[in-house]
């Protein structure tokens, strides 16, 4: 778990074998992120930014409004959880990024998401 500006981020990733096709260099991963608002006031997630790196060092940047079609308002002490996915051309890679947030007083701030691994289970024994 990573905490920044009284916000804790927890990440879990999983390889989706049923949607992957290694012979076509297509490896599908799902990741679930839990955002825990430790502040005494509500916060809203406005934007996301991801840097996705495959095992060959090739990178893809993804950015946009909110997450999974939402700009969630996360009340004080509450958690928001969502699941999304990434497709890589290699069986292992990483993701890192940040969220742009706004607090109840209208102050913008950024929550960094440190690097986490995407890998098929047989590679991380």
From Swiss-Prot:
One Pfam family it belongs to: DUF525
All copies of domain ApaG, residue ranges: 1-125
Matches recorded under Gene3D superfamilies: ApaG domain
Domain of life, source organism: Bacteria
NCBIfam families: PRK05461.1 (NF003967)
Cross-referenced HAMAP family: ApaG
Protein's name in the database: Protein ApaG
Annotated source species: Proteus mirabilis (strain HI4320)
Gene it is expressed from: apaG
């Amino acid at each position: 778990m990573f905490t920044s500006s009284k916000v804790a981020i927890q990440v879990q990733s999983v390889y989706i074998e049923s949607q992957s096709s290694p012979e076509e260099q297509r490896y599908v991963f799902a990741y679930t992120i839990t955002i825990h608002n430790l502040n005494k006031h509500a916060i809203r997630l406005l934007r996301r930014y991801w840097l996705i790196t495959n095992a060959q060092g090739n990178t893809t940047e993804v950015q946009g409004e909110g997450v999974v079609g939402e700009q969630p308002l996360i009340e004080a002490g509450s958690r928001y959880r969502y699941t999304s996915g990434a497709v890589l051309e290699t069986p292992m890679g990483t993701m890192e990024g940040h969220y742009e947030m706004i607090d109840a007083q209208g102050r913008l701030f950024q929550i960094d998401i440190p690097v986490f691994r995407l890998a098929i289970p047989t590679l991380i024994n």
